[in-house]
Amino acid sequence: MTEPSNADIAVMSFEDALKQLEKIVDDLERGDVPLEESIRIYERGEALKKHCDTLLKSAEDKVEKIRIGRDGQPVGTEPLDPE
């Protein structure tokens, strides 16, 4: 079975990228993958992790906190404070 090139990662959803990343981690933890294959899938895993991080950061940037006025009614939004 041939793995897709890393070029396909850019169009993956977060869920698909995470699923592939989890499979790569499982395969590497099993320890029965040949060295060359381990290196190749590790590099793909790095690209998947970077893509997931980018998607999470983008989602985080879109999340806003609703501001409540003294009367208890919403008065607007502001960026969510990073933790």
Swiss-Prot record:
GO terms (BP aspect): DNA catabolic process
Assembly behavior: Heterooligomer composed of large and small subunits.
EC number(s) from the headed UniProt entry: 3.1.11.6
NCBIfam families: PRK00977.1-3, xseB
Gene Ontology terms for molecular function: exodeoxyribonuclease VII activity
Protein name, as recorded: Exodeoxyribonuclease 7 small subunit
HAMAP family per UniProt: Exonuc_7_S
Keywords: Cytoplasm, Exonuclease, Hydrolase, Nuclease
Function statement: Bidirectionally degrades single-stranded DNA into large acid-insoluble oligonucleotides, which are then degraded further into small acid-soluble oligonucleotides.
Gene3D superfamilies in UniProt: Exonuclease VII, small subunit (1.10.287.1040)
Keyword Cytoplasm attributed: yes
Catalytic reaction list: Exonucleolytic cleavage in either 5'- to 3'- or 3'- to 5'-direction to yield nucleoside 5'-phosphates
Family named by the database record: Belongs to the XseB family.
Record bears the keyword Nuclease: yes
GO cellular component entries: cytosol; exodeoxyribonuclease VII complex
